Amino acid sequence: MDSKIQPTLRPGSSCPRPEWPEQERAEQLARGAALKWASGIFYRPEQLTRLGQYRSREIQRNYSLEARIKSVVQSYLEGVQTGVWQLTRALEAVQGTREALSQAHHLLKGLSRTSQTLEPLRECVVQHKQLQILTRLLPRLQAVPATVAHTQTLIDSERLLEAYVSLRELEQLKEETLAPLGGLELPIFQGLGLLAEALGQAVEAAAGAAGRLAREDPALLVAAIRVAEVETERTILGQAPRDWRQRCLRALQEGLERVHFASPVLPEPGALAGWLEALQVALPAELATAEALVAPCCPPSYRVVELWAHTLHSGLRRSVQQLLAGPELGAADTFALLHWALHVYTGKEMMGNLELGPEADVSQLEPLLTSENIEQLEAAFVAQVQVSVAQWLKKALDGEVAEWSGEQEPPTDPSGFYHSPMPAIVLQILAENIQVTNLISDSLHRRAHNMAVSELGAFLRSFSDALIRFSRDHLRGDAVAPHYVPYLLSAFNHQSALRSSVSVLLPDGEASGVLAPVEAALDDVQRRICRLVLEVLQVELQPLFSALPSRRWLLSSELLDGVCEQTSHFCQDFWRVRKPGVQLLLAEAERTVVLQYLRALMQGRLVCRGTDERSQAAERLRQDAAQLKELFLGLGLEESAHCAPVLLALRELLNLHDPTLLGLEVAGLRQQFPDVSEDHVSALLDLRGDVSREHRQAALSSLQAGPPPSPSTGRRALFSLVPTPTPSLSSCLPSGPCS
């Protein structure tokens, strides 16, 4: 073999072309190195002597490499030879195994045919064993139908523990037959499932009547609970576990709800309060029964009091929600439900009773009424109360208005003031509806306050409209009121009484600005009544003032005496008006008289023909001012409220002897009465009868050029309410309104 693996190439011989690129590259590198070395030798002749040594060294190295290659190839060949030998041995072993398996296969086929012939015998053996077991259990199996019937009888007679023991024995006998029979159930055991269900229903029924049984037959309740607990912890072969504990708890809840909330709560209008009162008594009694009687019959894990409280709460909440989903409740029912749910139910009388203990706490559960429910109920309650209040106020107003056209004077109180129960009725209606909402919540209280303010404002507007209709019908003659003015004065007292008591409508802690609409409505009613009263006075005085000013007026006080007499007679009933209303009426009456006086002066009926007449006119103005002052002081008007002194200011204008000083006097008049106009001044100058065009122009110019009136005067308008006749062309000035 060594001769076969000897290399056929010698050093320096040409090599065949390599088959791999790596080999070719290595050969190129080797040739390059050899050429490099040879070129170095040739360039250095002294090295040529060593060429023989190099050749012998290279030959030795080649021989060494060839020897190493031979050794490696030899080891590879020996390994291959060993592997071939092992493969041969393995092939022989596989062939032997194959032959053994073939023989075993033939043997198994024979055994299968043999086992098939023995199968009937095996079945006979199994049947023999089953018959042997059934023979041993035959007496017990024969008693199964009778035991089933007896167990059913025990269930029907509510002997639950005995029935459960009998059922357990039957189920145990069934388990003993299942394994030997290979899981086959005998027909006689097919009724056990129905029997167990009947017992479960009996347990459930007993739990559902726990409250009654705890009082009448606690032994039955205890038996039912014990059966449920034992059965829950037992496992039955081939069946799902019977969770009778959950059935029992569910029955406890359903029975409790059935007692108190079986039918939907749809009480008749007004009957809701009775239903709530019945629950107020029944629910605490039910919790007391649960704590004293039911809880000792149940395991502690049942937490009977907590279960009772939560069940009653959920049932009650569901009933309340059903009630709210039905027809809209009336105001009384809405109030009863809100008060009961927010205060009574959670109060000490019911669920907040300290004797119930923490297990009965329902504060962490969903409330009976959500915030949305409360909002809707409060809004509905206020809307219904508002309708009712509006109706009652309308009835009160209609009753009052019906008396205005009567033959009798308005009634008076012991002090002699005109009096009517209407203001007290109005405020009582509003105050009672506000006060009752304090029992519910602050939000409802605020709603009621706002409703009351709104309704009082509407009532005052209706009251004002009724006064207008009353006055219109009287003045037109459609329905003449015998006591027109007294009833107007009585109405004045009504608004005064309402104004003095309207503060009861102001919520606690609220600013008085909340009542601003009501106060504005009261002011409007007051102004309207004053206007209606003074219109009558104005009509009565108008014929008297038609003769003023005149020569007769200059010479005698007879005209003003008639005015004072008529005014005094008209104001004689003012004392029946309560203060400060009487002062307001007297002040307005005096103002009306003064305005009528000024209107008469401005009509140009009189022109003084000399100094004597001007002096007489000035003196008459002084006397008239004093007479009017005396009249109204006698009637009770405070002096600070008088406006008759305007006549004294006009007197100074008439009493002035030097016409050149009229400008100063007119400027002073404007300082006192900023609303005086050129027409008014011209009418007064016409009354003097001695003012030339130049003096008139100077006086009117001073009216425009004078200093602005002092803002501290605080006087009400007088002259702006006094009309003046259209001046003639001869009296028009370029600076006047006719220019």
Swiss-Prot record:
What subcellular compartments does it reside in?
A: Cytoplasmic vesicle, Secretory vesicle
Expression (tissue specificity): Ubiquitously expressed.
Any single biological process term in GO:
peptide hormone secretion
Q: Where is this region: Disordered?
A: 1-21, 698-718
Q: Which UniProt keywords apply?
A: Cytoplasmic vesicle, Exocytosis
For this protein, the record's InterPro entries field holds: EXOC3/Sec6 (IPR010326), EXOC3/Sec6_C (IPR042532)
Q: Which GO terms describe its cellular component?
A: exocyst; secretory granule; transport vesicle
Task: For the region Mediates interaction with EXOC2, EXOC4 and EXOC5, give the residue spans.
Answer: 1-370
Q: Quick check: keyword Plastid in the entry?
A: no
Assembly, in brief, is:
Interacts with EXOC2, EXOC4 and EXOC5; may be part of the exocyst.
What does this protein's UniProt record list under function?
A: As part of the exocyst, may play a role in regulated exocytosis of insulin granules.
Task: Please give the family membership noted in the entry.
Answer: Belongs to the SEC6 family.
What protein am I looking at? Exocyst complex component 3-like protein
